[in-house]
Amino acid sequence: MSTDAVFRPHRWRDLARDLRWWGQDYLYAATAQVRAAGPGRPDDLASGPHRPLVLLPGIYETWRFLEPLANALHARGHPVHVVTGLGSNRRPIVESAGRVAELLVDRDLDDVVLVAHSKGGLIGKQVMAFEPAGARVRAMVAVATPFGGSRYSRLMPTPSLRAFRSGDATMRALGASAAVNARIVSVYGAFDPHIPEGSELAGARNVRLEGGGHFRVLADPRVIAEVIRAAE
């Protein structure tokens, strides 16, 4: 019996699993975007006695995409700060990092843990590696972040999505800035339809989840557990 004959059923099962995760992923994303369209009061989250957290959503996401995570962490006593200047996070990484740094300084936040999704992790690393205010950051927990870029980026229709090419100047600079990696926790699924290269980051604490997806992994209990580990 050939090797292909032995392993082909496994490949079909893996494909079926990945397609199921993909469908569940977009259902989660659609539900989150509908929720994010409603009113929100970020200032209500900014109080608490414990270590401060700053939310960094992904591209085309507002802070409310991360609201369930923010509410859970705020309930544990952490002030959760929102960078409203990011909007839906379509600006270049360097510009967005400047806005995050400005918030850290304006609110005099120190010993901060960044909580990031996707592009937000690149913005957070840009702050940590290149902004003077990066010294105010204790750690970052980044979920489904394309630290090595995504090969799909070059096929995208907008400059904001094509910015994730591995050959992009900002992406190359971030890749070369390995000194801050030890302060980063990279959490990612077993399958990510947006990042075929994966989100493993050399020198970081890498946490591979059993489930898959790019969006729905935000609801995995390990995400909150890793933020708590970094912040408490």
Task: Describe each model-derived feature in a short phrase.
Residues 42-43, 129, 177, 199, ...:
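Hydrophobic alpha-helical segments, principally membrane-spanning helices and signal/leader peptides
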Residues 49, 137, 203-204:
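A broad structural signal for short, well-ordered beta-strand segments within beta-sheet-rich domains
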Residues 1-54, 60-82, 106-109, 231:
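Flexible, membrane-associating and regulatory peripheral segments of lipid-active enzymes
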Residues 180-232:
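C-terminal catalytic-base region of ester-bond hydrolases, centering on the histidine
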Residues 26, 65, 92, 152, ...:
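Short, function-defining helix-loop hinge/capping sites that tune catalysis or transport
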Residues 53-64, 68, 72-182, 194-195:
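Serine-dependent carboxylesterase/thioesterase catalytic core
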